[in-house]
Amino acid sequence: MKLLFAIVALLALAFLCADISAVKTSWPELVGETLEEAKAQILEDRPDAVIKVQPEHSPVTYDYRPSRVIIFVNKDGNVAETPAAG
């Protein structure tokens, strides 16, 4: 019985890990795109995302929030750095 429980627990853990790894957490392909294009793509990939927009090189907090995606934009309104969750 203990062996069966261990096998079920391992399978459940493997399923959870596989599910987590499928979640997109960064968008390097959006660098140079417009803010609106970036927002649309991120929300398509991650409907749970809470998007924050910051000017390029601005300070941010270092608390970790898995659903938060910060988009840094340059003076032209284009994505300046890779948007990433966290």
UniProtKB/Swiss-Prot annotation:
Q: Name one GO cellular component term.
A: extracellular region
Q: How does it assemble?
A: Monomer.
Q: What protein family is recorded? A: Belongs to the protease inhibitor I13 (potato type I serine protease inhibitor) family.
**Stated name of the protein:** Chymotrypsin inhibitor
Reactive bond, annotated site positions: Y62, D63
The residues forming the signal peptide are 1-22
Organism source for this protein? Lumbricus terrestris
This chain's function reads:
Inhibits L.terrestris digestive chymotrypsin LT_CH 1 and bovine alpha-chymotrypsin.
GO molecular function, one example? serine-type endopeptidase inhibitor activity
Tissue expression: Expressed in the body wall, coelomocytes and at a lower level in intestine.
Q: Where in the cell is it found?
A: Secreted
